[in-house]
Regions:
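Glycine-rich phosphate/pyrophosphate-binding beta-alpha loops
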Residues: 140, 261-294, 368-369
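Short glycine/serine/threonine-rich phosphate/pyrophosphate-binding segments
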Residues: 18-21, 43-46, 73-74, 98-103, ...
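Active-site pocket-lining segment
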Residues: 287-346
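C-terminal charged capping/lid subdomain of soluble metabolic enzymes
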Residues: 323-390
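Carboxylate- and glycine-rich phosphate/diphosphate-binding segment that chelates Mg2+/Mn2+
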Residues: 148-270
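Glycine/threonine-rich beta-strand-loop-alpha-helix active-site module
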Residues: 74-177
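ATP/NTP phosphate-donor binding region
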Residues: 1-90, 345
Length: 390
């Protein structure tokens, strides 16, 4: 046995940890670029809460709030230009995976020259970036736990990760208390993304003992708590009776949030596999929500690949009270149903005419995902799988 495990991220987990933002930021300078989406962090009051703490500590700040879902490389460049012009010492991200990923691109390009796409496709390398602090407001992408920033090139539709240790956050403030403003549909999609991260890392070719232990634990947490938490949030949003009592709700938020962060950590080392490799072209082409795309793709991929590593897939199936790995795809479909997620690509606007582009783009942005998948995958296999998903 031989492996290495390296993940230099300071995770600060706990209720109301966000109130310590100034203390976490102080070692990195006196001026921050705050990266958010257009409305959510402001409507929830979290942005004002963070700003008040920074003001009290005399840490200056400037706002960049132009990030949308499936963030673009061009948006990251706009943010980097602002960080440069304002002489910011650090970047603070407040938001979900799109915000954190874009903030990583901003922090990176604020100190590096050239075309960001050259770095994404490894034509150029650098291990420098502004210090990054993240406050995740959704529990799904796990971006707080790794050195990946997924960005889409608007000219080509290529959706691929910027990857380097420099964009691993210096501090990740993982506060379950700030998750509660998520609408039900957001919780469903990000929660399923977290589940896929852990499943793919656990079954990847580059899995190792540390990632196996973490990912298996995270899948256990999500199997127990994700659907009940979603049903509770949905009931409250619809003005119905609560599903969980206060103690159960606290435990559920902690568990799903923790599992999400673990998912980000394990993919930093063990990577993701074909499920993510096939979803990125889909959301690059149609701008669909990542977790919604995975809800269609992951069950089909699991059914196609499980027999290449039955021991691992059998272990996962048992978590969901299914007999063996051949039933894991069906277990995932039941979760998709319970989360009210989409079950086919047709409902997301795809047709047979899109399949050639999707297949080609897998080989542009996701050859590493194919190589990391335990089953041997061909171009014809990917075409067959996309057709099954329509």
């Amino acid at each position: 046995m031989e492996f290495s495990y390296f993940l230099p991220v300071n995770i600060q987990f706990g209720w109301n940890k966000v109130d310590n933002i100034a203390g976490f930021a102080a070692p990195y300078g006196k001026k921050a670029l705050i990266v958010t989406g257009r409305t959510s962090a402001k409507k929830s009051g979290l942005y004002d809460r963070v700003v008040a703490k920074l003001d009290a500590a005399h840490i200056e700040h400037v706002l960049f709030d132009q990030v949308d879902a499936n963030p673009l490389t061009t948006t990251a460049l706009d943010g980097a230009a602002l960080a440069k012009s304002e002489s910011c010492d650090m970047v603070i991200a407040i938001g979900g995976g799109s915000i954190m990923d874009c903030a990583k691109g901003i922090a990176f390009m604020a100190v590096n020259d050239g075309d960001i796409n050259d770095y994404i496709f490894n034509r150029k390398t650098s291990d420098n970036a502004l210090p990054l602090i993240v406050i995740p407001t959704t529990c799904g992408t796990g971006s707080e736990g790794n050195g990946f920033g997924v960005l889409t090139n608007p000219e080509t539709g290529d959706k691929k990760s910027l990857r380097c240790n420099a964009i691993v956050p210096k501090v990740s403030i993982v506060d379950p208390a700030v998750m509660g403003t998520m609408p039900p549909h957001v919780l469903a999609s990000v929660g399923f993304d977290a589940l896929c991260h852990n499943i793919e890392a656990y079954t990847s070719k580059t899995a190792q003992p540390f990632t196996d232990a973490l990912a298996h634990y995270a899948v256990t947490l999500l199997a127990q708590y994700l659907v009940p938490l979603y049903k509770h949030v949905k009931a409250i949003a619809n003005g119905q009776e609560a599903v969980l009592n206060k103690k159960q709700l606290t435990k559920a938020w902690e568990s799903v949030t923790l599992a999400s962060t673990i998912g980000g950590m394990v993919i930093n080392t063990a990577g993701v596999t074909l499920g993510h490799g096939m979803e990125h072209p889909a959301s690059g082409l149609k701008d669909i929500t990542h977790g919604v795309g995975l809800a269609v793709i992951e069950p089909v991929v699991v059914e196609y690949t499980w027999s290449a590593n039955p021991e691992k897939f059998n272990s996962l199936a048992r978590i969901f009270n299914h007999g063996d790995g051949s039933e894991l795809g069906e277990a995932l479909r039941l979760i998709v149903h319970d989360l009210d997620l989409t079950t086919n690509l047709t409902e997301l606007g795809f047709t047979k005419k899109d399949i050639p582009w999707l297949v080609d783009n897998v080989y542009v942005v996701a050859t590493g995902n194919i190589a990391n998948t335990v089953a041997k995958i061909s171009r014809d296999d990917i075409e067959v799988l996309y057709k099954k998903m329509l």
